[in-house]
Amino acid sequence: MQLTERERDKLLIFTAAQLARERRARGLKLNHPEAVALITAEVLEGIRDGRRVEDLMSFGAAILTPDDVLDGVPELIHEIQVEGTFPDGTKLVTVHDPIRGAASRRVAGEYLLEGGEIELNAGRPVTTLTVANTADRPVQVGSHFHFFEVNAGLRFDRAAAYGFRLNIPAGTAVRFEPGEEREVDLVPLGGSRTVYGMNALVNGDLDAPGTREAALEGARAAGFGGAQ
C-alpha cells in the first residue's frame, strides 16, 4: 500500500477507536484518548458513508454518554474537529461538547472560581492612545512589548507611550489591520523597568537620565510613526 500521511493518521485513529470499542464492550469506562478516538472514527465513517456535515455534528455528540467514560473526561473534551473528504470537497466537522448530559458535580482537579470580573492592573494609571496602522500589512503587538518601540508603521503619540505597555492579559496581543485606527489602553511597565531588544531604542533603564530623550531622537531618525 502507498499511504499518505493523512491516511496513516486515519488508520491510527481507527486502531485506537477499535481498542476503545473492545474495552467499552468489556464494561470498562473510556479515558480521554479512547473517547476522542472513538468519536473521531465514527465521524470519519459517517463522512465515508456520505452523511452531511450538519448531521454529523449532531451524530458526534450522541456516540458516548457520561456513563461510558471515566469521571472528568466529559469536562476535558470541549470540542472535537474532524476533517474529511465529502463529495463536494474537504470540510471540517466540529462536534461541540461531544459527551453531553454530565451531571453538575465537582470534578477532580477542577478550579472553583469566584464570581465577578478581574480588573486588569488594578490601581495602576491607564493612558489611552489612538493608534493608526499606516503599513500595508497587519501588525500584532504582544502584551508586554514596550509600546513606544512597536512597528514604525503604527502612528500614534510615541512620546506618550514611552515606558508603557498594552493593558491586556499577559500572553495575549492586539492586532492592527492595514488602515485601521483604534484606541488602546496602556499601563506603565513594572518590575525593574529595564528594556532590551525590541527595536533597540532604549536598551537599558527606562528612567535613566537622558534615556527618554535619546530614544525619542532615535525614533524620529528612524521614521517611526508619531515620533516627529
Swiss-Prot record:
Pathway listed: Nitrogen metabolism; urea degradation; CO(2) and NH(3) from urea (urease route): step 1/1
Q: Return the annotated region ranges for Urease beta.
A: 102-228
User: Has keyword Acetylation?
Assistant: no
Q: Specify whether Cytoplasm is a keyword of the entry.
A: yes
Q: Which reaction does it catalyse?
A: urea + 2 H2O + H(+) = hydrogencarbonate + 2 NH4(+)
Please name the Pfam families in this protein's record.
Urease_beta, Urease_gamma
Choose any GO biological process term that the UniProt entry carries and state it.
urea catabolic process
Q: Which GO terms describe its molecular function?
A: nickel cation binding; urease activity
What are the boundaries of the signal sequence? none
Q: Where does it live in the cell?
A: Cytoplasm
In the Enzyme Commission scheme, what number(s) does this protein have? 3.5.1.5
Q: Which family does it belong to?
A: In the N-terminal section; belongs to the urease gamma subunit family.
What is the name of this protein?
Answer: Urease subunit gamma/beta
**Which taxonomic lineage does the organism of this UniProt entry have?**
Bacteria, Thermotogati, Deinococcota, Deinococci, Deinococcales
Instruction: State the encoding gene.
Output: ureAB
